Amino acid sequence: MMAKTILRVLLSRPCFRRQFCTSGQSTSINPEEIKKFDNLSSLWWDEAGEFRPLHSMNSLRIPFIRNGLVNSRAVSTTKANTSRSLDGLDLVDVGCGGGILSEPLARIGANVLGLDASQEAIQIAKQHSLLDPNLSGKLQYRHGTLEELAEEGKLFDAVIMSEVVEHMNNPQHCFNLAAKLVKPNGSLFVTTLNRSYLSWLGGILIAERLLKIVPPGTHDWDKFLTPLEVENMLADSNCNTRSVHGMAYNILTHNWHWTSNVSINYALHAVKSGEKGSN
């Protein structure tokens, strides 16, 4: 029983997350994935529940995004360690769910648009944001798709795709759309699962087939992307990878830490090439 509990914590992920981009067509949503997610939407802000690893992951995601923006010169080094380090920057959180990442980004000054294909998730996110009056005017949520947002022509200082790409049917199409949203010299941040023996062993064989911690078929290992594949896809979208770091989850403390091993989880930062004549 203890082994099952530990593995369940380790492998619990937003496995029912939305698929934003299934093809190059206008429809980019998988209704079955949406339905699964809608049934669990009320769990987003239970920090000791199914989404505990995502809440804990913010301890890495927030500084990773901030430091990436410093390295790309969107944020000055003198401003980096202030409480409003992202003040004035426009960010879009693709697949924002209930707002676990969107809210803390807004709290350090960013103007954040949370985008999600689940209307239930957006409602949860909106309701929770009302609990903090300081988020007013800094955080907006929208039910929609990347295609719809890209058609509007608005540009952002950074696009964040955290724990989303492993559920895409057509990741190149999604990266192309995401890149269209990024300003020249702007950033794109990705966190996801590697397609490796270790990720198959833990996420598929043990969790789904042996212990049945999560329903069989929850994860599709073939959809996991290696860091090199993501780098190449982003390069085709005119974005150059600046850094890749492995992430590891401690099943006893429920904390994440950085590691040189990218076999299971990793974070990637890319920068969109500037227009001709830009510095």
Would you name each region that the model predicts?
Residues 212-229:
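Acceptor-substrate binding/catalytic loop of class I
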Residues 6-7, 11-51, 55, 59:
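N-terminal, positively charged/glycine-rich alpha-helical extensions of SAM-dependent methyltransferases
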Residues 56-87:
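Conserved alpha-helix/loop element of class I SAM-dependent methyltransferases that forms part
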